[in-house]
Amino acid sequence: MIGISRHTDYAMRIVLHLSALPESTQVTADEIARKRLLPRAFMRRIIVRLAEAKILRTVRGAGGGIMLARPASEISMFEVVVAMEREVTLNPCVDHPLFCPLSVSCPVNRAWEGVTKQLQTTLSGIRFDQLANAIEPKSAKAGYTGPPSAGAGRKSAKGGRRGRS
């Protein structure tokens, strides 16, 4: 199977949750876990990785929490995948030519290289502000209705903007 790890999927949900909130809003990991249906056991490790990648900022102590380190419009899906997976490649030969002695002359390797570049380009072009704006008012999954104040800036069911004045 070609895919991403569960940790990467969970990281996407964390960044999406924060992207749907007004800029600089700080929330707890427990709130995100509850609202995005994430197992709390994985949260700390994922948050640390995202903070190391300068995607999230953490505040310790009483009143602490997490927030985006920069605007959602400056964070791409590619960055989150790299933070969690360390590299985005579909075949080890693409990024590590010494892995296979045939990689230099292999047409399959060149095909994988092209597909990998397309994937990286596509993921780099998807920003979290775009994803946050695409959140439906109600998710079909488990009655999720979005984070508090998530309606700010999103379209209402009647098609107009709601929240920000």
Regions found by a protein language model. Give the residues of each.
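A short alpha-helical element within helix-turn-helix/winged-helix DNA-binding domains
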Residues: 27-37
